[in-house]
């Protein structure tokens, strides 16, 4: 059976996007890499593990077969897997993609193998002509599924593909804006996860609202420095994919990255925090990859650097904060 859209990844965000598109009347296929999970969703008509209260409409089907999901998508494939699985997922589905099907992704992070942006990975695997787009912005899956008002940025390689995506997503409670700035849309989504961990650590240490606001604001400044160095535009980082996603993820406890940081700040064992959250914490890998990318590009990202040291070098969180405060005074914005 042909579908307009196949969504690869049946976690909370992949399922939420599949539900959004299917509720808009677009035939959609949702792929899970675990056969037992796919079979349970097909039988129960819901994703009991992640979004148990959302019933699947008739326009949403489920499969455990990645080749089927790729081959039957006539219009586009939407990848919603963790960043560490992005390259492998594309490698596996690439031989089966329809020639005219575009590629979208809602994954927020960098390529673990090369440390590059995900559109570079997609171009490497799929070639230069495939329509590409990234979905990024301040969206929690549970709120989208509950049909609470939400908005995102669609960074698309062509105006026509961006308009198509908006037609699949847009409705009375979900608004999508387009941009051709794929770099800014991707880096906003990747950097904010690291900064959300930093904000969580600060709150876990009990440093208060002033410190949180300073971390968010200065975090935005270093996110912008890296993004502009890579060719992004300022307005993208000041929009939904940048400041919007950063504020949401750094301040609300629905954020897995923020909750992880809270636990670290309170001195809890990492394994215990991971087990309690039970899902991917993208900011951990992103802290290393973004820190390394900033080093290659000569971009100063002090909050990211101290977060990296806490996560990978065992630096006590209190010392990381002290290192940030003891930096030499400087103008707020570079000239």
Swiss-Prot record:
Under Enzyme Commission nomenclature, its number is: 1.1.1.94
Q: Which InterPro entries match?
A: 6-PGluconate_DH-like_C_sf, 6PGD_dom2, G3P_DH_NAD-dep, G3P_DH_NAD-dep_C, G3P_DH_NAD-dep_N, NAD(P)-bd_dom_sf
What is the annotated localization of this protein?
Cytoplasm
Q: Which Gene3D superfamilies match?
A: N-(1-d-carboxylethyl)-l-norvaline Dehydrogenase, domain 2, NAD(P)-binding Rossmann-like Domain
Q: Does the keyword Oxidoreductase apply?
A: yes
Protein name per the record: Glycerol-3-phosphate dehydrogenase [NAD(P)+]
Q: Which residues bind sn-glycerol 3-phosphate?
A: 108, 137, 139, 192, 245, 255-257
State the encoding gene: gpsA
């Amino acid at each position: 059976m042909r579908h307009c859209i196949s969504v690869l990844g049946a976690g909370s965000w992949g399922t939420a996007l599949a539900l959004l598109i299917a509720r808009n009347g677009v035939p959609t296929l949702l792929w899970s890499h675990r056969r037992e999970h796919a079979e349970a969703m097909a039988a129960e008509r819901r994703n009991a593990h992640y979004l148990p209260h959302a019933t699947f409409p008739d326009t949403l089907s489920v499969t455990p077969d990645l080749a089927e999901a790729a081959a039957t998508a006539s219009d586009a494939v939407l990848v919603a897997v963790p960043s560490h699985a992005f390259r492998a997922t594309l490698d596996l589905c690439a031989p089966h993609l329809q020639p005219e099907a575009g590629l979208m992704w809602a994954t927020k992070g960098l390529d673990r193998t090369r440390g590059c942006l995900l559109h570079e990975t997609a171009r490497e695997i799929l070639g230069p002509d495939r329509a590409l787009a990234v979905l990024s912005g301040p969206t929690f899956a549970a709120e989208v599924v509950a049909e609470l008002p939400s908005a995102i940025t669609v960074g698309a390689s062509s105006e026509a593909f961006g308009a198509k995506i908006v037609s699949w997503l847009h409705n009375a409670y979900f608004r999508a804006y387009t941009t051709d700035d794929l770099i800014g849309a991707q880096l906003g989504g990747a950097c904010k996860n690291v900064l959300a961990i930093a904000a969580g650590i600060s709150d876990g240490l009990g440093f208060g609202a002033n410190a949180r606001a300073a971390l968010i604001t200065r975090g935005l400044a270093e996110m912008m420095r890296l993004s502009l160095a890579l060719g992004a535009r300022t307005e993208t980082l000041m929009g939904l994919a940048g400041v919007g996603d950063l504020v949401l993820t750094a301040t609300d406890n629905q954020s897995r990255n923020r909750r992880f940081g809270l636990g670290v700040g309170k001195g809890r064992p990492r394994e215990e925090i991971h087990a309690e959250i039970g899902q991917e914490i993208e900011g951990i890998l992103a802290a290393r990859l973004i820190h390394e990318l900033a080093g290659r590009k000569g971009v100063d990202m002090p909050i990211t650097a101290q977060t990296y040291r806490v996560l990978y070098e065992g630096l006590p969180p209190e010392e990381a904060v002290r290192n940030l405060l003891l930096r030499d005074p400087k103008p707020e914005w570079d000239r």
